[in-house]
From Swiss-Prot:
This is Small ribosomal subunit protein uS17. It comes from Geobacillus kaustophilus (strain HTA426). GO terms for biological process: translation. Part of the 30S ribosomal subunit. InterPro entries: NA-bd_OB-fold (IPR012340), Ribosomal_uS17 (IPR000266), Ribosomal_uS17_bact/chlr (IPR019984), Ribosomal_uS17_CS (IPR019979). GO terms for cellular component: cytosolic small ribosomal subunit. Belongs to the universal ribosomal protein uS17 family. Keywords: Ribonucleoprotein, Ribosomal protein, RNA-binding, rRNA-binding.
Amino acid sequence: MSQRNQRKVYVGRVVSDKMDKTITVLVETYKKHPLYGKRVKYSKKYKAHDEHNIAKVGDIVKIMETRPLSATKRFRLVEVIEKAVVL
């Protein structure tokens, strides 16, 4: 059996679940400034495939890179790490 190649795995917060079987995940990370060396926080949104519509807005989720599923979707939901607190 061949082993699957290394894939990008990100942890982020769901900011939108309005689409069917698709969630938008905000991933925040730090990047070092090339000249000054200060860590700068930046964020990026990824669309991810959620087959069973499990994730809701505010959930912390893990997403993994996969083959292109649409024009903008290149990730799929692996697991919901933490459910959002509903007040």
